[in-house]
């Protein structure tokens, strides 16, 4: 029986009977995979702690006829402190959902995995504004799944630009003043510059960025459009994020 080992984060889980459940793990080596954890629902199961949502650990699997089964696991960080604050829980659930909707099963993406785990640790240690961190992660997600935004050049005529008043969902970037605007939305120069800056900034340095609410709201709307357009599903957590932003 061949065993597969990888670090990973539990994205979500689903009960399949009174004892067993399926967990979806974003792994470093194999991308997102679904895994049967037999007996994980039992109170004394060795799998119980390692199969909770958000848990980051070392996992060992074996391949069955149709899917992986969990053989063993060791917790690196449970991230269960996320559960104690509603806003933090909602944002972290949203990040997990982004990974789930953007990644096909078995599609490795080590760069995105690194950004994902780093973002979790930054949130855990309260390093920076969680909303700005989420926008930065969305930009990394778009880049590492093939939808990188072109913000240094006009997306139509390819002329170099310092800023733009319009972002096109069709052309994945800014539109200069000489080109026709289509398939996107207007943006203020401040929000455009902030998007461009965040897109290039390492995730661990995002704490240095201080954005006002208007800019954060603009960025939220712009990136929500790209995410809704390019992935198979719209994250359900977006509804909760909207509630948080309205409070």
UniProtKB/Swiss-Prot annotation:
Free-text function comment from the UniProt entry: Involved in DNA repair and RecF pathway recombination.
Family: Belongs to the RecO family.
Protein's GO biological process: DNA recombination; double-strand break repair
InterPro entries: ARFGAP/RecO, DNA_rep/recomb_RecO_N, NA-bd_OB-fold, RecO, RecO_C
Pfam families listed in its UniProt record: RecO_C, RecO_N
Origin superkingdom: Bacteria
GO CC, alphabetical: bacterial nucleoid
Keywords: DNA damage, DNA recombination, DNA repair
Keyword DNA repair in record: yes
Protein name as annotated: DNA repair protein RecO
Coiled coil start-end: none
């Amino acid at each position: 029986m061949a065993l597969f080992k990888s670090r990973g984060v539990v994205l979500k889980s689903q009960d399949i009977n009174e004892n067993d459940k399926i967990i979806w793990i974003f792994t470093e080596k194999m991308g997102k995979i679904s895994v049967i954890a037999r007996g994980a629902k039992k109170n004394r199961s060795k799998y119980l702690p390692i199969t909770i949502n958000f848990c980051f650990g070392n996992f060992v699997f074996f391949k069955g006829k149709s899917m992986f089964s969990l053989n063993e696991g060791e917790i690196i960080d449970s991230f269960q402190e996320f559960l104690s604050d509603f806003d933090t829980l909602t944002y972290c659930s949203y990040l997990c959902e982004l990974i789930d909707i953007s990644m096909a099963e078995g599609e490795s993406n080590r760069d995105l995995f690194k950004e994902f785990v780093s973002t979790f640790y930054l949130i855990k240690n309260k390093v920076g504004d969680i909303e700005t961190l989420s926008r930065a992660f969305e930009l990394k997600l778009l880049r590492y799944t093939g939808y990188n935004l072109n913000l240094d050049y006009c997306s139509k005529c390819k002329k170099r630009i310092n800023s733009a008043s319009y972002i096109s969902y069709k052309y994945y970037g800014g539109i200069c003043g000489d080109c026709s605007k289509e398939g996107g939305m207007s943006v203020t120069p401040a929000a455009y510059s902030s998007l461009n800056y965040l897109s290039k900034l390492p995730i661990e340095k995002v704490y240095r960025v201080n954005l006002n609410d208007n800019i954060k709201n603009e960025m939220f709307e712009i990136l929500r459009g790209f995410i809704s357009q390019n992935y198979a599903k719209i994250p359900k957590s977006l509804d909760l994020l909207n509630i948080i932003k309205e409070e």
